[in-house]
A protein has these predicted regions:
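Beta-lactam-recognizing serine transpeptidase/beta-lactamase-like catalytic domain environment
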Residues: 65-66, 75-78, 200-210, 251, ...
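Periplasmic/cell-envelope proteins involved in peptidoglycan metabolism and beta-lactam response
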Residues: 1-276, 369-381, 488-491, 497
Length: 527
């Protein structure tokens, strides 16, 4: 009996001890939760009652004028279209096989691809599909699939397809502008997201709003591009490439008074609506050759050298020389293009005949220092600063590296590499009484609040005198009158222009050749 009572007593004491220990543990937890971690659990409770929703902002539009349809209206070349994307949180999906089956039919995707994407326990995976219509989004939402949700977003749309595509650039799937206007003005075009913070009940319904920040749409830009002129230029360029079996081509039209680019076209181009296809097949098409591709300009460089000689006073239009069909410089023989001796010529006739040997003589009168100085003043050693992504500066040996052969070949546009836009900008100085005007593509800025800002032209320095430009313009007019092709195309207009042909230089020296080891040439006309 005593043994039994002792056993019972021991057990009661042990039980009491355990109860007391548990009591103190429970008491500690209550103090910890209610006092020590009160803030943490209060925040957790509030977070379960709160919700936060992001409101998307629309990217700014890119607009142009149209001198034919309505000069006072704007026409969009790039704007946002609201669409939807479908997302999944794999660790919240209860039946992944069924989910993959349901989504495959709704999204027109392979069931296996969907299943492979969601067959994990991740909290985040990339969207299963973007660019859904409202009907598609509603069909998925109505299924109430666990772990699958719809997000509104904006997709960039280019209503004119390939028109001015390399000037515009494109917007990628993450909403980031690449190349062209889209890339250059990406931060301004991109709007600021808004958000709503509120409280919800146990069923997830909003019962009060705590704060709201409205989305701010992006800034819009009106370009200097004329839609009808751009379309006309692209059609003519495409036909010329086909007719002459050329690999590519570029056309730039610039307002010589304002610097505004009226048209800028290159072929081949791409459709920014389908930029992914181009990225996979030929991403080089994204690059705008008008501002990025370097080439040796050839004879279209000659009027700029003549302008330099006249402006510096080392020659006059009537200064004469006698020229053979070739000349030797530093051991190199330079020929006229037709291997023909033009004999006695004045400066105007040298330009009219496009005489390489005569141009070497012009360069001799200029000398290294003056020739280099004027080439720099015409802007060939720097970027033009146009408001487009991807511009390249011209290239030419440093003055201290020049020999006589450098000075000689540069007078007829070889040994110097430029972009098409640099050439156009330099020629606009000749048309603008010697004043350089910086090229640009934005005409007006439209801010999210509706206010507008007109972009003023930006003038550079006086490169040559007005008298010099008047003289050279008359020379270029004579060049057109003495020719046949340009003259026949410009009846009724007084046009000054110059044609040029040059080989394509290789990075390691020499010139590009085709499979038959024949030179590859670039043909140009400017005026």
């Amino acid at each position: 009996m005593d043994t039994y009572q002792k056993t019972i007593g021991s057990r009661l004491m042990a039980f009491s001890f355990i109860v007391i220990v548990l009591f103190f543990i429970l008491l500690y937890r209550m103090v910890e939760i209610g006092v020590l971690q009160h803030g943490h659990y209060l925040a957790l409770a509030e977070s379960q009652q709160r919700f936060e929703k992001t409101e998307m902002a629309s990217r700014g539009r890119i607009l142009v004028h149209d001198s034919v349809s309505d000069p006072n209206s704007y026409y969009p070349l790039s704007f946002d279209v609201k669409s939807f994307s479908v997302w999944a949180v794999p660790n919240q999906i209860r039946d992944k096989q069924k989910t993959a089956t349901d989504l495959a039919s709704l999204l027109s995707l392979a069931k296996s691809d969907i299943f492979n994407s969601i067959d994990n326990s991740k909290l985040y995976i990339p969207p299963l599909k973007r660019g859904l219509t409202l009907d598609q989004a509603n069909n998925i939402s109505n299924k109430n699939i666990s772990g699958v949700f719809i997000m509104p977003e904006y997709n960039r749309f280019y209503p004119e397809g390939t028109l001015a595509s390399q000037l515009l650039g494109f917007v990628n799937a993450d909403g980031v502008g690449n190349y062209g206007v889209e890339g250059h003005y990406n931060s301004e075009l991109t709007g600021k997201e808004g958000n709503v913070v509120g409280e919800k009940d146990t069923l997830g319904r909003m019962i009060s709003m705590l704060s709201q920040t409205n989305p701010q749409n992006g800034t819009s830009y009106v370009l200097t591009i004329d839609r009808s002129v751009q379309y006309f230029v692209e059609q003519k360029l495409a036909k010329a490439i086909t007719d002459y079996q050329a690999d590519s081509g570029t056309v730039i039209i610039m307002d010589v008074k304002t610097g505004g680019i009226v048209a800028m076209a290159s072929q081949p181009s791409f459709d920014p609506n389908n930029y992914k296809e181009t990225a996979n097949t030929d991403p080089a098409k994204f690059v705008n050759p008008a501002i990025a591709n370097l080439y040796e300009p050839g004879s279209i460089f000659k009027p700029l050298i003549v302008s330099s000689a006249l402006d510096s006073g080392v020659l006059t239009p009537e200064t004469e020389g006698v020229f053979d069909k070739s000349v030797n410089v530093d051991g190199y023989t330079i020929h006229t293009a037709e291997n023909k001796a033009f004999g006695r010529e004045n400066v105007a006739q040298i330009l009219q005949h496009s005489d390489n040997v005569g141009m070497v003589w012009v360069g001799d009168h200029l000398g290294n220092d003056l020739e280099y100085k004027y080439i720099s003043k015409f802007g060939f050693l720097d970027k033009t600063g146009i408001d487009l992504d991807g511009e390249t500066a011209g290239r030419m040996p440093a003055l201290k590296q020049w020999r006589d052969i450098n000075r000689a070949t540069i007078t007829f546009g070889q040994g110097v590499s430029v972009t098409p836009l640099q050439m156009v900008a330099a020629y606009t100085a000749l048309a603008n009484n010697g004043k350089y005007v910086y090229p640009h593509v934005v005409d007006k800025i439209i801010y999210p609040d509706g206010s507008e800002k007109q972009i003023a032209k930006q003038e550079g320095e006086q490169i040559v005198s007005q008298k010099t430009t008047e003289t050279v313009r008359e020379m270029l007019y004579s060049v057109v009158q003495s020719g046949k092709i340009i003259k026949s195309l410009t009846q009724g207009f007084k046009v000054g222009a110059k044609t040029g042909t040059a080989q394509i230089p290789k990075a390691d020296g020499g010139y590009e050749t085709n499979e038959s080891n024949l030179g590859i040439f670039i043909h140009s006309v400017i005026g």
